[in-house]
Amino acid sequence: MPTYRDYFADIKKRITEATPEKVEELIRTGEIQLGDVREKDEWNAGHIPGAVHVPKSYLEQWAEDRLPEKDKTTVLYCAGGVRSAMAADILQKLGYRNVISMAGGFNRWKDSGRPWMTPASFTPLQAQRYSRHLLIPEVGEAGQQKLLDSKVLLIGAGGLGSPAAYYLASAGVGTLGIVDSDVVDLTNLQRQILHTTDRIGESKVSSAKRTLEALNPDVKIVGYEERLSAANIDRIIEGYDLVIDGADNFPTRYLLNDASVKHRVPVVHGSIFRFEGQVTVFKPFEGPCYRCLFPEPPPPELAPSCAEAGVLGVLPGVIGTIQATEAIKLLLGIGEPLVGRYLLYDALEGSFREVRLRRDPECPMCGERPTITDYIDYEGFCASPAEWRAQHAPAKVSTPAD
């Protein structure tokens, strides 16, 4: 009757092993999937950077989610090389084409002086609060810690800023800056879900702060009860990883764009009109900026405000939530953000369509020869673009430094 020794010897014949040195070479190529098949307590004590946790006890259930590419070289390791050998055999039976078990496991890797790390440490309450994130391979513990360390600035605590702030706070984005000089009005409550009836007359920043801190005490709310302007935008935007654009006027959008390019801070742009909404991501010098898309604002009669034209109350929820999604993708470096892509939503049709956007080489802000090198009179520019251009001949400029 076969013994365990016989069983394991048979497995070793069917799998491929590699030394820690060889595995390190494979990791440098970036062409492998790296899986740690140890248990949770072992993983928490330290693991190889770039590895995903796929404990052998859940291997069959979790493998296809956490190690999704069956045709890619997959390297597994455990503490000493036994469990990873068995796991490699299992993955081969599940259709993985090139599976390698690291001989000697994590112990040999660590003893030979190779790099390793400990995962982010969460409090018991945080582990419970973010448990659904921790289960997602693209987020996990490292991603959740990245969110907790991130800083997002929201322009406006209104229709778009409300749902975006709600979901960024619930996701655990560590610092949310909110810029808004307005107060809560009864007409806001049809769509601005950060605010409540008893807060009518209260500043929107104060109301938003109360709501978000009650939702998630992990999140630091920084309020700016001031209108965004050329005089304060450099001070406000400094230190933030990205900006959510919930502005409701063109001067602020152009100002934000120019500051975004100057500081190289991505902007997740959203806009709404009655039953229609649009979302895109302006990532400086990796895609078009707002001026590439809109060299000048439309006449006021073609772009009325929500107060003038109205808006379906739930529409900002759809668009603002997409903005929050794009922000999280950018912060985590996952997926395909809407850079160079303009997503349009029609609520009446229940349809989405996408338009591809390109950088304008003649763009006065991010083009090859920019003519706008400082903040301008945005009110004057938006009131009469042609007159403004006539009064401001291009000056000699230098390209923003890389």
Give the residues covered by each predicted segment.
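Adenine nucleotide-associated cytosolic modules
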Residues: 61, 70-72, 93, 111, ...
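Rhodanese-like catalytic fold shared by cysteine-dependent sulfurtransferases
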Residues: 1-33, 40-75, 79-145, 188, ...
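Glycine-rich, N-terminal phosphate-binding loop of Rossmann-like dinucleotide-binding domains
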Residues: 37, 78, 246-248
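Short beta-strand "acidic-cap" motif of Rossmann-like dinucleotide-binding folds
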Residues: 34-36, 101, 175-180
